[in-house]
């Protein structure tokens, strides 16, 4: 009998695809089951039904995996943050390695050295930034501060025992939640467009211990935050509190953005050390959220580039210039291009902080700016956002004829599409290595080393 949307079916998970999408078959029809793991038998409700595939949501696990372990976090299963805390870490790495390789196989990309995946140095308490949301689990319920509940668009579950951040985060969260519960201030409701409390964003530099607390609200209520500031200052920190901020965000979207920034205490940035260099991180600037993992990731990039003393390196989608600056001490010249002006300003500031005189950072759309750059690169580093490299930018990357390209990807699906274009235009994939920056989640970074055919 044909599968129908809304109906429930018993399914055996046989395969897995990125990002942590279990694959089952029903009468020959491929069914994608989110967070299903091969070996499980599940009861799933069909949410989407197309001619060539269906999508299902797990209602119940009927037969589980023999190697499952107990998750450390009491909110696991209810919280939408972590997917695999109940799977041993070695198995998590095995799954991610398999998912990357399968994507390369499907894209008919082969002939490269597929290196073992690198695990995160820390499986727990690894994050240097966390964005918590104010809300309630059920409409009209008690104020919560934490993560979106699993499978719910608006429900928020408190993350007071979150295990992917350290004790300082948990103490700040609990102090904040207790204070605002007592004050009975309303959280922002995105559909009604009303309320005050939006987010609590905490950044903590792993290697320096500097802590920055950022309370995000609307301007709908004029509330004095002096008492709150003193409460946050009075916490017994393992690290070092350097700033408390109040960000006004009246945007209609769910994204944390800044309409106005007030410094309640200290300063509005932290300094992080990575591989002997210093990086200034501002409230909204992008920075890899796993510092110890980032050191490993950037070491892999440096290794893939190889000897670079006489080389000009292009760092495209450079953000705050982290990768470019880490290779700069060994390079002749580094040119970074980034769309976000604030990130470029941070990159320039960081280069000064590190006494690097061979770095130039340009703000603008890569697809446009790349046309105007006169220098010829010996190495191009690509580190694009999830959608991959813009097709126009990729055309210019190819025209530059760089002997070496190192592609750092946070989305292996778009990575393989870009690699197909590079291979069609004279590049050979030499090596591929996964790097797990996000234990217990489906996400994985992939580093790819390419060489132009005529340089081999």
From Swiss-Prot:
The keyword Heme does not apply. Its EC number is 2.1.1.-. [4Fe-4S] cluster binds at residues 73, 79, 82, 162. One of its GO terms (molecular function) is metal ion binding. It is an enzyme of class 2 (transferase). S-adenosyl-L-methionine binds at residues 288, 317, 338, 383. Keywords: 4Fe-4S, Iron, Iron-sulfur, Metal-binding, Methyltransferase, S-adenosyl-L-methionine, Transferase. One of its GO terms (biological process) is rRNA base methylation. The active site is at residue 410. Residues 2-60 form the TRAM domain. It comes from the Bacteria. The keyword Methyltransferase applies. Belongs to the class I-like SAM-binding methyltransferase superfamily. RNA M5U methyltransferase family. This is Uncharacterized RNA methyltransferase CTC_01941. It comes from Clostridium tetani (strain Massachusetts / E88).
């Amino acid at each position: 009998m044909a599968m129908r949307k809304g109906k429930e079916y018993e399914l055996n998970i046989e395969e897995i695809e990125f990002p942590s999408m279990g694959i089952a078959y029903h009468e020959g029809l491929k069914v994608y089951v989110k967070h299903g793991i091969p070996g499980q038998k599940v009861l799933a409700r069909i949410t989407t039904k197309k001619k060539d595939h269906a999508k299902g949501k797990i209602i119940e696990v009927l037969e589980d995996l023999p190697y499952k372990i107990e998750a450390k976090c009491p909110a696991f299963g209810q919280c939408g943050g972590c997917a695999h805390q109940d799977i041993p870490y070695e198995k998590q790495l095995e799954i991610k390695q398999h998912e990357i390789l399968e994507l390369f196989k499907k894209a008919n990309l082969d002939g490269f050295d597929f290196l073992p995946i690198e695990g995160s140095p820390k499986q727990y308490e690894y994050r240097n930034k966390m964005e918590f949301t104010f809300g309630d689990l059920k409409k009209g319920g008690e104020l919560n501060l934490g993560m979106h509940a699993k499978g719910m668009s608006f429900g928020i579950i408190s993350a007071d025992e979150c295990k992917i951040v350290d004790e300082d985060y948990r103490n700040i969260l609990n102090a904040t939640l207790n204070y605002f519960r007592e004050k009975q201030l309303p959280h922002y409701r995105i559909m009604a467009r009303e309320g005050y409390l939006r987010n609590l964003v905490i950044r903590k530099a792993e290697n320096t211990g500097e802590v920055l607390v950022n309370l995000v609200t609307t301007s709908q209520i004029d509330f004095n935050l002096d008492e709150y500031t003193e409460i946050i200052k009075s916490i017994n920190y393992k690290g070092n509190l350097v700033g408390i901020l109040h960000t006004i965000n009246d945007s209609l979207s769910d994204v944390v953005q800044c309409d106005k920034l007030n410094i309640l205490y200290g300063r509005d940035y932290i300094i992080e050390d990575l591989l002997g260099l210093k990086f200034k991180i501002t409230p909204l600037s992008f920075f890899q959220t796993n510092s110890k993992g980032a050191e490993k990731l950037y070491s892999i990039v440096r290794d893939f580039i190889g000897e670079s003393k006489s080389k000009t390196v292009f760092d495209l989608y450079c953000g705050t210039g982290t990768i470019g600056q880490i290779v700069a001490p060994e390079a002749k010249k580094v040119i970074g291009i980034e769309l976000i002006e604030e990130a470029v300003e941070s990159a320039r500031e960081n280069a000064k902080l590190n006494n690097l005189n061979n770095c130039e950072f340009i703000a603008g759309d890569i697809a446009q700016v790349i046309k105007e750059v006169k220098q010829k690169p010996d190495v191009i580093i690509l580190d694009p956002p999830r959608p991959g490299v813009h097709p126009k930018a990729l055309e210019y990357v190819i025209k530059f004829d760089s002997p070496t390209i190192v592609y750092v990807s946070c989305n292996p699906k778009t990575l393989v599409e870009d690699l197909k274009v590079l291979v069609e235009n004279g590049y050979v994939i030499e090596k591929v290595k996964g790097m797990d920056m996000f234990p217990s989640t489906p996400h994985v970074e992939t580093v790819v080393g390419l060489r132009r055919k005529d340089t081999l």
